Amino acid sequence: MRLNWFSPLPPAKSGIADYTRQLLHSLTMAADIALWTDQEHWDPALEAYAEVHTYRLQEMPWPEVNRATMSIFHIGNNQRFHGAIWQVSQRHAGLIVLHDLALQQLFAGLFREQWHDRMGYLELMERFYGETGRQDGEDFWAGRLTIEYMAEQYRLTQYAMDPALGVLVHSQRSYDELRHDCPCPLSYAPLPYAIAPPGSRRAEGNGEPNPSGPPYQLIIFGHISENRRLTSVFRALAAFPEQERFRLHVYGELWDHQRLRREVEDLALQDVVTLHGFVPNATLEAALASAHLAINLRFPTMGEASVSQLQIWNHALPSLVTKVGWYASLPTEMVAFVRPEQEIMDIQAHLRAFLSEPWRYAHMGEDGLRYVQTHHTPGAYVQALIDAVKDAEAFRPSAIAHDMARKVGQEMRRWTNRPAGDVASDLWARVGGFRHDHAGGHPSLGGLNYRHLEILKGLREKLSEQVQEMQRQLSKGLQAIQRAAWDECYPPAHVQAGRGNTHSLIHHRRYLTCARPYPA
């Protein structure tokens, strides 16, 4: 099985790039993987496991792409990393892996920041959310609504799933939310995370908490956008009487570095907070290994499971998380919850409790490590992924018919602004010589004529061509299998000569099960 893998690749500053790096070894044990990227640079170490192909949207190498059994598209809400991947998925149906359940940021980034397509964005919002969605889209475009509000109210997940042959999510909660609306097979598999990075407490065989301190080391890391709640953390520390007993280290790209630096200065936290920015993975792993407590808040949440949370547990670190989305489903013995409506108060309460009972928090990290080892193994994830690919492949003929029906419906809608079923019934009545009003149906629709029938006929012929092409491809594959079977049953004479009497018996037995001779 050959799979195309469209994903950010290291050293891209993306947790999904790290996910690909960690999974690649297990993945290549189960399938032939072709990595696809529009990045100019990638970690050469990846090429020890898989071929790396580059692409440009304007010049897609479709013959090479079409060699694979299935294409797997990794979709998240960062337009820089996933915009091109999503665009390829619209032109070449495959399996969508959703790394975020709310994709408003992805599409807002494409339509507003990259394409400057206001009307396209508003039409998209109206298509999925009606007039209210369009009006809020207007307000967002004009700066009257925030992207956080839009992501919470209007996820636009359906837009990414529309052309897919299959969808894979990483949490039971996401699966339950999408199962009734997904237009194709939907699968669920917990995120994989099994590699113990060099320098981690787990790699050293030591799950015990860092014995040093005070000051105790707090850590926040990853792609730091506004929903990571840094301002609330800063304010909680600024008003905490024993702030000198903590040091907060922030690693990762910041959405507004200057603003956050000003907040640190305004709150007089220069001796407590350090903004490190993006650092190499080895530096981050060393920081995690020496930390005492991780802060992994997200509000609003984008809905899916968190690679960074698995990375925290991989270091047996206790963590504070927001009680929303996937995080809310985590066992209470593994994380310390922070309520969105009481953020500052809850953060301070946990800091106070940590100073009083550090070992209670250390046990949370140890329980998290055991949870990762049990529920997030790469082997189980790869098997679930392969099963999802098989389901998607089986769905392919239905997807062609569904796509055709959607195109017909869109065409009919433009004719009369009436449901496609009404239009089809009216045209059928005209062909059969019947009238709707006499048959108890809808009144005959004005403006329809035989030109519209010709359009439908053209669409039908296009579908027929697609089906015939699929049949030709299947036929070629079957012929190749048949030829291979024939060669196995009836090898050339020079091969037979070297096999002696043992071959004669094997050859005789195989002959009984072989298909009829393959024609020359």
Regions found by a protein language model. Give the residues of each.
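A conserved mid-protein helix/loop that constitutes part of the nucleotide-sugar donor-binding site
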Residues: 18, 225-239, 258
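Acidic donor-binding loop of glycosyltransferase active sites
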Residues: 69, 165, 288-303, 317
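A short, active-site helix/loop in glycosyltransferases that binds the activated sugar's phosphate group
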Residues: 146-186, 195
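Conserved donor-binding/catalytic core segment of Leloir-type glycosyltransferases
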Residues: 168, 211-228, 249
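Glycosyltransferase donor-sugar binding loop
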Residues: 247-260
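Nucleotide-activated donor-binding/catalytic signature segment of Leloir-type glycosyltransferases, i.e.
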Residues: 260-282
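C-terminal amphipathic helix plus adjacent low-complexity
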Residues: 369-491, 505-510
